Regions:
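Mixed-charge interfacial surface used for oligomerization/domain docking
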Residues: 2-23, 29-168
Length: 168
């Protein structure tokens, strides 16, 4: 995958530029989670951390980043082999909206199911409240795929309920 490709690229670059040091980290993150890890690690660098300290920080921090999300359409979960065709059809007819997360090994895991999009968004808000450490200091990043109004609503919920530092 991406980590293996990074290791191959690092090896080639180290051979070409032996005076430089490259550290590759398996972030176990995707999308905005990776962006958040890079942001937090760059902050450490800006505070004076050297390469080893920054890499150590990233290794320790990667498992504290939660990836929680919901999808509106089960088609892509079916196409990706995450759910059966029957489950996709039945779930679609019943209006099931799964709440998913990435586990500590980088695998997509189903956490819960909601009977409406609004309830799924509420579950995301509640899960944030359970898991967030220092919500004001550690940013939460909300991304969306063409559902900006719901992302704005989730941000509003997190800020009002938890005084969260949210990046949208």
């Amino acid at each position: 995958g991406t980590y293996s490709a990074g290791c191959v690229a690092a090896k080639e670059l180290c051979e070409k530029y032996p005076e430089r040091r490259i550290t590759v980290i398996d972030s176990l993150c995707g999308s905005a989670g990776l962006g958040l890890l890079v942001y937090m690690t760059a902050k450490k660098r800006d505070e004076g951390a050297d390469l080893d300290a920054a890499a150590d920080f990233a290794e320790k921090t990667k498992l504290t980043i939660g990836h929680w999300f919901t999808v509106d359409d089960l088609v892509y979960l079916r196409r990706g082999g995450r759910i059966s065709p029957t489950a996709a059809v039945v779930g679609g007819l019943l209006g099931i909206k799964p709440v998913l997360h990435m586990d500590d090994e980088g695998h997509l895991v189903s956490f819960s199911k909601a009977r409406s999009r609004k309830k799924a968004i509420q579950m995301l808000c509640d899960k944030y409240g359970e898991l967030a450490l220092s919500p004001k200091e550690n940013p939460a990043i909300i991304t969306h795929g063409d559902c900006e109004s719901e992302a704005v609503e989730l941000k509003k919920m997190l800020v009002e309920k938890y005084d969260a530092n949210v990046i949208l």
